Amino acid sequence: MPYPGLEVVVQYWLYSLVDDWHSTQRSVAIPGAGTVRMPGIHQHHEGDWEAVTVGMSADRPLFVDWSAHCAGEWRPFAGATLVADPGGERTHPVSWVALGSHANLPTPVTARPRWWNCDPRVATFVHQRVQAVIGAVAIAALGSRLDDALGILDRAGSGTPQAFPLALVNRTTWPMTFPGIWGGRERMEVGPAGRALGWSPPTPTLQPLWRNPLTTIFGDASRSRGR
C-alpha cells in the first residue's frame, strides 16, 4: 500500500437503474474477405453500482480511485481533475460517466472498457459468436485488431461537471442493509444471439471494494495506477 499516512477512506457510491451498453458498430475492410459489417454487441443488466474512493491522511487527501466496474483506476490526488464549490477552492475530484455502461472514469475518454476483463466468459462468448457470424478466416485476418473492429468502447463525454445530493450511509443504513443483488441476470447479445452471463451487482456492503477497499484498490492486478 503506497500511502503509509492513510487514516480515512471515504467512498461515494452511485446507483443507476440499468446498465445498457452498445458497441459502436462498424464496417471493416478485411484482406481476403472484402468489407465486412461487424455484428453489434449489447450488454445489459438491471441495477448498477459504481464508486469513487478518496483516501486521506490526517491533513490532506492522498489518492482517488474510480471503480469502473471490476477493474478500476487510482491516481494520486494531485492527478485527479478537481472542481470547486462557488467561490471555493478546487477540492472535489470529477468522475466522468460512460454512456450506457456507467463506468466511472478519471477523464472524458473513449477507450476499451475495463469491464471487458471482469468475466472471462464474456470475451469468450463474444469472440465465439463473432466467428460464427464473420467466419474464422476473417477472425484470423483481424488478429489483435478484433476488439477494435467490433467497436468495444466506453464513451465518456466532456460536459460540465455537476454536483448531486449526497446521503451519509453506513452498513446499517438503507439501502446498504439490502442483502442481495439489484436485478436479474446480465445478458450479452452478439447480433441475433444472446446469453445470460452473470448477475446484476450486489449491494455495496457485499462487494470487495466496500469490505476491503485497500486490498481491492492496491492489491488487484486488474486495477491500474494512472498518471
Functional labels for PLM-detected ranges:
Residues Y3-Q11, L17-R227:
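Domain-length functional cores that host ligand/cofactor binding and catalytic or interaction surfaces
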